[in-house]
């Protein structure tokens, strides 16, 4: 983070985190994992819900398809739950908790989140050390993973000591607030935008998991907070929406 590019990336991510910080903190608490794990979302995606890596890892927490399905992140032609900040955060928290239960150490759990549990298992078996720093010294983990855990620790220290790192003046984006309403029929997002007098871009931002400009029947659509009653009433007046 000492380079201009690295610092700009960190600051933009911390600013964007304001939209999701309270949500992530709540889910991590509910799943019983340390709050510091929020910094994995910064390292993985910079808190971008629609981030996609060169290896097709997707979403804020960068799940590949198989791992996502393992933790209940469903995909269809209409939506991809890996792009849903709340669902993906819960899946990531549960995955990290499982990794901790497997390795008995949060540093190893974080390393396994990056390179997969098999990579950490092989490193432990090869050296006889179930300790990240011993594995680090022996250079038996992938280079990316050897750097990954220190990056998470560095971000944790920097955020907790924001003044010491000239980060105290970052103005975070306001949190995204919303209600949810189940759609009884295929519903165009532009219609919801018209009903709520909000831009379509906001409706899409509230629903990053949607791959199209419509929500399928049965989908729990996120709508601007406080709009549930009049959105429901307006949809009831539209033929075919019941």
Predicted regions, residues:
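Short, surface-exposed glycine/acidic/tryptophan-bearing loops
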Residues: 51-72
């Amino acid at each position: 983070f000492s380079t201009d590019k690295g610092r700009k990336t960190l600051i933009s991510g911390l600013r964007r985190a304001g939209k999701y910080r309270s949500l992530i903190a709540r889910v991590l608490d509910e799943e019983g994992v340390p709050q510091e794990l929020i910094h994995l979302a910064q390292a993985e995606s910079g808190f971008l819900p629609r981030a996609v890596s060169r290896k097709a890892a997707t979403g804020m927490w960068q799940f590949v398809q198989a791992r996502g399905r393992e933790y209940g992140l469903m995909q269809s032609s209409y939506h991809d739950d890996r792009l849903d900040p709340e669902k993906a955060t819960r899946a990531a928290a549960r995955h990290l908790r499982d990794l901790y239960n497997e390795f008995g150490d949060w540093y190893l759990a974080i390393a396994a989140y990056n390179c997969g549990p098999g990579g950490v298992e092989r490193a432990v078996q090869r050296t006889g050390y179930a300790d990240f720093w011993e594995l680090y010294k022996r250079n038996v983990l992938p280079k990316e993973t050897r750097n990954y855990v220190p990056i998470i620790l560095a971000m944790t220290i920097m955020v907790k000591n924001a003044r010491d790192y000239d980060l105290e003046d970052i103005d975070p984006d306001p949190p995204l607030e919303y209600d949810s309403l189940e759609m009884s029929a295929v519903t165009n997002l532009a219609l919801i935008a018209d009903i709520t007098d909000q831009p379509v871009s906001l409706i899409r931002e509230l629903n990053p998991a949607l791959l199209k400009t419509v929500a399928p029947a049965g989908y729990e659509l996120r709508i601007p907070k406080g709009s549930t009653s009049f959105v429901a009433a307006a949809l009831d007046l539209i033929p075919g929406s019941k």
